[in-house]
Regions:
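Extended hydrophobic/aromatic segments used for targeting, binding, or gating
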Residues: 111-141
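Conserved short secondary-structure transition element at the edge of the structured enzyme core
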Residues: 13-17, 45, 51-113
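Structured helix-beta-strand junction loops
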Residues: 6-8, 75, 128
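Glycine-rich, positively charged active-site loop/lid region within alpha/beta enzyme cores that binds
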Residues: 2-71, 135-140
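Alpha-helical segments flanking ligand/cofactor-binding loops in enzyme cores
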Residues: 1-2, 84
Length: 141
């Protein structure tokens, strides 16, 4: 993000919900259709590994989501917190989440109008990211 800001380049974030992981709706028992990339590309078998769950192993992602749940501010959904988090970075000009239903579009869009996350929440998410996400994915970028 720092380099983009230095060069005055905006960042459009793709997959800010990590293929749905950050909606909080999946469980270890979740099953994806055979033609869903979350079923057939978990280890990058068909295309870039980072396209599925942002490069994380599904079980690792589920564990991280459970660690995030206590941080969700009152009045926010997990989805909204995840989107609000990425939009808190000054270099990010737009987040492009996917949606299958109209109500998901509304929930996604409303995240931009929610109050900023507290510095304490941002710090806890940052610590979780550095500890649990960065070691698994940054070598792919």
């Amino acid at each position: 993000f720092k380099q983009a800001q230095h060069k005055r380049v905006g960042i459009l974030t793709r997959l800010p919900l990590s293929s749905g992981l950050l909606t909080g709706k999946f469980t270890p028992q979740s099953i994806f259709a055979g033609d869903d990339h979350r079923a057939f590309n978990r280890r990058g078998e068909a295309f870039d590994r980072g396209e599925t769950f942002s490069g994380l192993d599904f079980q690792t992602g589920l564990r991280i989501v459970e660690e995030l749940r206590p941080l969700i501010p009152s009045g926010f959904s997990m989805t909204q917190m995840a989107l609000r988090w990425i939009l808190m970075f000054p270099a990010v000009t737009c987040a492009i989440p996917g949606a299958k239903r109209a109500e998901q579009v509304g929930e996604n869009a409303s995240a931009a109008d929610l109050p900023p996350l507290s510095e304490a929440t941002m710090q806890k998410i940052r610590e979780l990211y550095e500890r649990e996400v960065r070691p698994h994915v940054h070598q792919y970028w």
